[in-house]
A protein has these predicted regions:
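Short, contiguous pre-domain boundary segments
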Residues: 34-53
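Short metal-coordination and nucleic-acid-contact micro-motifs, chiefly zinc-binding Cys/His arrays
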Residues: 4, 18
């Protein structure tokens, strides 16, 4: 059965009828209404060199469409793991802030310094493990949703093949003479690096960790001092976790996951699969809202 094709008006490359942008020069072939919103507008500029990692992260915050447009051209340089690392370091700083808010009676400088480092490392490791598991679980479930809405995995297999490709084994028929047209994407010449690229969509949770750090630094006030010999810091910390401030922290995480993350994950999936923005956005929001309810809104700390 023949497959409908469409020709790019800018570079002349032929793309499948289901493509929304030319795979080589980036020219939009089909335009959805939602792409009139700046956050979702596809970038059609020529690409020459990748942005530095810090500029990628900045654009993920202020202009995610541009960020993922750049990342998609050289996906192996995606800052996804850096974002996970920075977010985990912020967890460590949160632990440091919590410890410094304790009033410890009769503690020496050596004791305080040792416990400060211990709290930082403990929260850093917890943040890394927790977020690693959470992010990859979300990537898995977002992929399932995108498979339902736009056939995400099938599109990736069609564009990039299955598994790792050895350099120089690309079939000539899959390449266009326009594949290097003004910095064209050469999407067929690199692996999908799906997880690395989709990790970037969790930048909002990293930003929210900064907000949580500020909120806890201002609003975390444990009741009474820690008297060494009468109570342990562990038991005191457990009691402090019941303070109302944690409801605010949990709500910030829930709102971010339900409202902000779906926008970035939609653009990441759209750029990877060259698919519909609108259809991916619907499933991403449904998944995000559902997960935020189960993971965050059902936490005991949210309701005291």
């Amino acid at each position: 059965m023949s497959v409908a094709m469409q020709r790019c008006p800018r570079c002349g490359n032929e793309s499948s009828g289901e493509s929304y942008a030319c795979s080589f020069c980036g020219k939009r072939l089909r335009i959805e209404r939602i792409e009139r919103i700046p956050f979702f507008r596809r970038i059609e500029e020529d690409w020459f060199n990748p942005y530095p990692w810090y500029l990628k992260i900045l654009y993920l915050i202020i202009n995610p469409a541009r960020a993922f447009w750049d990342i998609n051209h050289l996906r192996k340089k995606s800052p996804g793991m850096l974002i996970l690392l920075f977010s985990s370091l912020l967890y460590g700083l949160i632990g440091l802030v919590l410890f410094n808010r304790f009033r410890i009676s009769g503690a020496s400088i050596t004791f305080t310094s040792a416990y400060s480092i211990a709290f930082f490392l403990m929260f850093f490791l917890f943040g890394f493990i927790y977020q690693f598991l959470l992010f990859y679980f979300l990537i898995w479930i977002y992929t399932k949703g995108a498979n339902y809405s736009v056939g995400f995995t099938q599109r990736l297999e069609k564009r990039f093949g299955i598994g790792r490709q050895k350099q120089g084994t690309i079939e000539e028929k899959k390449l266009s003479p326009f594949s290097i047209y003004k910095g064209g994407t050469l999407l067929q010449k690199q692996e999908a690096f799906k997880s690395k690229m989709m990790l970037c969509a969790f930048t909002p949770l990293m930003i929210m960790n900064i907000v949580k750090l500020i909120v806890l630094a201002i609003g975390f006030n444990p009741r009474g001092p820690v008297v060494l010999g009468e109570s342990t810091i562990d038991s005191f910390l457990a009691a402090s976790m019941k303070l109302p401030i944690w409801s605010v922290v949990d709500a910030l995480d829930a709102i971010t996951l339900a409202a902000w993350v779906p926008i970035l994950i939609t653009i990441a999936i759209r750029e990877l699969s060259n698919s519909s923005t609108y259809r991916v956005l619907i499933t991403s929001y449904l998944i995000s809202i559902t997960v935020s309810i189960f993971i965050f809104f059902l936490r005991p700390t949210l309701f005291g």
